[in-house]
Amino acid sequence: MNIELITQLASLILIVASGPIVIGLLSLKQGNL
């Protein structure tokens, strides 16, 4: 396994996972659930 591939996969996973988390936190702060 190349270190570059691992870092790219990790960054993609972080970006994909951070999307719903940020939306959830914003909705919790606004109380629009």
Swiss-Prot record:
Membrane topology: Single-pass membrane protein
Subunit structure as annotated in this protein's UniProt entry: PSII is composed of 1 copy each of membrane proteins PsbA, PsbB, PsbC, PsbD, PsbE, PsbF, PsbH, PsbI, PsbJ, PsbK, PsbL, PsbM, PsbT, PsbX, PsbY, PsbZ, Psb30/Ycf12, peripheral proteins of the oxygen-evolving complex and a large number of cofactors. It forms dimeric complexes.
Name this protein carries in UniProt: Photosystem II reaction center protein Psb30
Subcellular location: Plastid, Chloroplast thylakoid membrane
Functional summary from the UniProt entry: A core subunit of photosystem II (PSII), probably helps stabilize the reaction center.
Top-level taxonomic group: Eukaryota
Pfam families reported in the protein's UniProt record: PSII_Ycf12 (PF05969)
Alphabetized UniProt keyword annotations: Chloroplast, Membrane, Photosynthesis, Photosystem II, Plastid, Thylakoid, Transmembrane, Transmembrane helix
Gene this chain is encoded by: psb30
InterPro entries registered for this protein in UniProt: PSII_Ycf12_core-subunit
Species the sequence originates in: Lepocinclis buetschlii
